[in-house]
Amino acid sequence: MSDAGRKGFGEKASEALKPDSQKSYAEQGKEYITDKADKVAGKVQPEDNKGVFQGVHDSAEKGKDNAEGQGESLADQARDYMGAAKSKLNDAVEYVSGRVHGEEDPTKK
């Protein structure tokens, strides 16, 4: 599930699986526009308001953008992605642990 106003993971997956050669110009244009809109939404949405997977995706996108701009090595990119994923997974574990132990849902405070 994706955050409100963000491109869903199912939509991203189906777009990635279908080769561009099999897409109409309208489909390619729609993908381009929705990808750019999702990227902007990811940059303006605060990190603490993102779901786990949306946060990981945005961190990966940021790493990709940085790598393209600075020529980072693949190892550096992988390290960045792993750091972001670990951070978000840690947040998820803390959330689940708190809920199991009866703490109030922090997203509803």
From Swiss-Prot:
Q: Where is this region: Disordered?
A: 1-82
Inducers of expression: Strong, by heat shock, by entry in the stationary growth phase, and by cAMP, probably via the activity of a cAMP-dependent protein kinase. By glucose starvation and by fatty acids.
Which residues in this protein are found as Phosphoserine?
Answer: S21, S24, S59, S73, S97
Its GO biological process annotations read:
cell adhesion; cellular response to heat; cellular response to osmotic stress; cellular response to oxidative stress; plasma membrane organization
Enumerate the InterPro entries for this protein: HSP9_HSP12
What GO molecular functions are on record for this protein? lipid binding; protein folding chaperone
> Is this entry keyworded Phosphoprotein?
yes
List the keywords (alphabetical): Phosphoprotein, Stress response
Q: Where is the composition biased (Basic and acidic residues)?
A: 1-21, 28-50, 58-67
Transmembrane stretches, start-end: none
GO CC, alphabetical:
cytoplasm; cytosol; endosome; nucleus; plasma membrane
Other notes on this protein? Present with 4490 molecules/cell in log phase SD medium.
> What role does this protein play?
May play a role in a switch from carbohydrate utilizing metabolism to fatty acid utilizing metabolism.
Family (UniProt): To S.pombe hsp9 and C.albicans WH11.
Name of the molecule in the record: 12 kDa heat shock protein
- Organism the protein comes from: Saccharomyces cerevisiae (strain ATCC 204508 / S288c)
Source species taxonomy: Eukaryota, Fungi, Dikarya, Ascomycota, Saccharomycotina
Q: Which gene encodes it?
A: HSP12
